[in-house]
């Protein structure tokens, strides 16, 4: 304390606070002009605004209010550093038309609605010294646009009308005096309740880090565009199924399909007694694997399949992979034991959302042997074709 030359601790605290304020305002004071003759206002992010203007910018208006993007930001110089100013923002119609989007372009569509009493937005830092306004860019990021008059300080605009933001600088702290009104043609936009031009939607997604909410259902259901869009703006997320052990694509075109050929309720149901068929030289039987993008339970035998071997109703018991189509003893006949195995793996499982019969004794789908000796279900597409030269017509399930 002695080094600061303060007589009391409170004096030292005041001196420290005043020095902080002085250093904070020094940057703005260097840009000041007490006469205000060199007052200048510059639009920040002008190239971005220009890019939106080239395709006719659109701004969303909602009942609860929606913030603008791009955000209106300006830089000011030439204010009196020691004078007090307030910054205000309103929106003025740019023409006498109502607009509509037809065949990829905006065209006039009749007379505009009567002008409403739009609220004037006062920057939350107002009033403040000129040095404060000049030290950094002034952002109107909290402005909300609405299409309903709710009296909450939001800016009410008519949908399908074109507007241009206007910034007003008012000197306060004495007799109020309007110092400057300024606007920028690059910031013109059409108020809409939903984006009409897909190019505008793409630009919003590309440059706005909070644009995930702008994605519509069509874009969410077309993942082929996801990698490109995600590389442009890292804020986008797509829902996808966990990666299967057989290497499913990250953004699969079958996102709405289940990962396994049967629902979990069927996967967990047990049946007994069973006869296990798998690839082996001892019984010369082959069971074809499912599609490599389906997730199957892990097992010591990758191609293991269980088929009920019973004349009556099935009873609970352990099973690796339950058979959903019980085979009755009277429904199977084998006429040609010398057939060859049909290795058409594409007919192993049904990939559509078809209802599956429950595994009970009251529902049975008979199997009928064809001339070639293969076994196939009646009515639906063939699920499994089995043939074995070691089996004879006298053998029954």
UniProtKB/Swiss-Prot annotation:
PROSITE patterns reported in the protein's UniProt record: TBOX_1 (PS01283), TBOX_2 (PS01264), TBOX_3 (PS50252)
DNA-binding region(s), residue ranges: 48-216
Matches recorded under InterPro entries: p53-like_TF_DNA-bd_sf, T-box_DNA-bd, T-box_sf, TF_Brachyury, TF_T-box, TF_T-box_CS
Gene3D superfamilies: Transcription factor, T-box
Region: Disordered, residue numbers: 220-248
Main subcellular location of this protein, as a coarse class: nucleus
Protein localization: Nucleus
GO CC terms: chromatin; nucleus
GO function terms (MF aspect): DNA-binding transcription factor activity, RNA polymerase II-specific; RNA polymerase II cis-regulatory region sequence-specific DNA binding
Any one GO BP annotation for this protein: heart morphogenesis
This protein's UniProt keywords: Developmental protein, DNA-binding, Nucleus, Transcription, Transcription regulation
Superkingdom assignment: Eukaryota
Biological role: May be involved in the initial formation of the chordamesoderm.
Name this protein carries in UniProt: T-box transcription factor TBX19
Gene: TBX19
């Amino acid at each position: 304390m002695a080094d600061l030359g303060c007589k009391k601790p409170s004096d030292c605290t005041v001196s420290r606070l005043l020095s902080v304020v002085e250093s904070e305002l020094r940057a703005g004071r260097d840009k000041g002009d007490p006469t205000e003759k060199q007052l200048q206002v510059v639009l920040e992010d002008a190239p971005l605004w220009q890019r939106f203007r080239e395709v006719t910018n659109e701004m969303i208006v909602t009942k609860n209010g929606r913030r603008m993007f791009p955000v209106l930001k300006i830089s000011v110089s030439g204010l009196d550093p020691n004078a007090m100013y307030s910054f205000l923002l309103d929106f003025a119609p740019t023409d006498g038309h109502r607009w509509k989007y037809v065949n990829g372009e905006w065209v006039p569509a009749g007379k505009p609605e009567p002008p409403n009493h739009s609220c004037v937005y006062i920057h939350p830092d107002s009033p403040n010294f000129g040095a404060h306004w000049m030290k950094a860019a002034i952002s109107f990021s909290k402005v909300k646009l609405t299409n309903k008059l709710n009296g909450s300080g939001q800016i009410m605009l008519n949908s399908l009308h074109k507007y241009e933001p206007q910034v007003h600088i008012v000197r306060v702290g004495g007799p109020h005096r309007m110092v400057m009104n300024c606007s920028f043609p690059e910031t013109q936009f059409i108020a809409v309740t939903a984006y009409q031009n897909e190019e505008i939607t793409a630009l919003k997604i590309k440059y706005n880090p909070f644009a995930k909410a702008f994605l519509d259902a069509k874009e969410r259901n077309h993942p082929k565009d996801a990698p490109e869009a995600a590389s442009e703006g890292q804020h986008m997320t797509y829902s996808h199924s966990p990666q299967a052990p057989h290497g499913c694509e990250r953004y699969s075109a079958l996102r709405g399909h289940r990962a396994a050929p049967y629902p979990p309720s069927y996967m967990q149901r047990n049946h007994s007694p069973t006869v296990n068929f798998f690839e082996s030289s001892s019984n010369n039987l082959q069971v074809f694997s499912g599609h490599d993008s389906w997730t199957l339970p892990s097992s010591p035998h990758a191609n293991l399949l269980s088929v009920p071997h019973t004349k009556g109703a099935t009873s609970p018991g352990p099973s690796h992979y339950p058979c959903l189509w019980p085979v009755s003893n009277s429904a199977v006949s084998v006429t040609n034991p010398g057939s060859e195995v049909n290795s058409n793996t594409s007919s192993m499982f049904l990939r559509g959302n078809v209802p599956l019969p429950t595994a009970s004794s009251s529902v049975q789908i008979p199997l009928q042997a064809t001339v070639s000796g293969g076994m196939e279900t009646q009515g639906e597409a063939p699920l499994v074709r089995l043939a074995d030269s070691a089996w004879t017509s006298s053998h029954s399930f």
